[in-house]
Regions:
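Catalytic loop of short-chain dehydrogenase/reductase
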Residues: 142-181, 193
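Conserved Rossmann-fold SDR core element
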Residues: 94, 169, 179-194, 236-243
Length: 261
């Protein structure tokens, strides 16, 4: 397991860096929180409705000295305020993992205006607002955005989701260039199939994985390692790491109905 830069086993709590993970209470987000905590970070766990899971994870990570919980509905605005609140918890904020997302499989003609707004709000606008608020502090730090291997393709059946993720990919590069003089690094990870979408079976996911060039799903442990690498490597910015078993190399739609969340 990588260790946060400047942190060793004898460091005091005040010396430990702090990371905010959106959608951190469950599934992939919870795994990222565990990995960051194990590498020396104190973690601010953001949740929307998963309050019990977030509190349970907080206890698992060592209690209030090592982890905190903040609740917010990113579809209703206020993402910038979440950054300010996270910094106040431990008196510092060193990095953000934009993991929270919504997913619906609807085409451009089928998706309603309200559904499109929600997709854009949660998957693009909220992460961007958080990044911008983080940069406005004028302090060095890092940001890792969770994307999707399909940003390199055109899957017209999940239009709102993909429009938002493609926008976040472009924002990753633009913000990395713009904020480099501030010492802020902005990177992203684009995973393939990590977990079945809730309600879907492992068999359904396995059939999708068989269509990928490497024919393997993305282990959540590898995803966590990639996030830690981008968080702790000071010379990397504006990079998108594809952990998708080659999905981004395929130009045709493979009929995916499962995502990492």
């Amino acid at each position: 397991m990588e260790t946060a830069m400047g942190v060793n086993s004898g460091s005091s709590l005040e010396d430990r860096p702090v990371a905010l993970v959106t959608g951190g209470a469950r599934r992939v987000g919870a795994s990222l929180c565990r990995a960051l905590s194990a590498s020396g970070y104190r973690v601010v766990i953001h949740c929307n409705r998963s309050h019990a899971e977030a509190r349970g994870l907080q206890d698992e990570l060592g209690g209030a000295e090592y982890a905190a919980v903040l609740a917010a509905d990113l579809a209703k605005g206020g993402a910038g305020r979440l950054v300010c609140s996270a910094e106040k918890v431990f008196g510092r904020l060193d990095g953000i993992v934009n993991n929270a997302s919504t997913y619906r499989r609807k085409s451009l003609l089928a998706i309603s205006d309200s559904e499109l707004r929600e997709d854009l709000e949660v998957n693009f606008l909220a992460p961007f607002q958080m990044m911008r608020e983080f940069a406005r502090r004028g302090k060095p730090g890092w940001i890792v955005n969770l994307l999707d291997g399909r940003i390199a393709k055109d899957d017209v059946e999940c239009a709102g989701y993909l429009l938002a993720k493609k926008s976040l990919a472009e924002a990753t590069r633009l913000c990395a260039l713009d904020w480099a003089p501030l010492g802020i690094r902005v990177n992203a990870v684009a995973p393939g199939f990590v977990l079945p979408v809730e309600g879907a079976s492992e068999d359904a996911l396995a059939r999708l994985v068989e269509r990928l060039p490497l024919r393997r799903r993305t282990p959540v442990e590898e995803l966590a390692q990639a996030v830690l690498f981008l968080a702790n490597t000071s010379s990397v910015t504006g990079t998108i790491l594809y952990l998708d078993s080659g999905m981004h190399l395929q130009k045709s739609d493979t009929g995916e109905k499962s995502t990492r969340l």
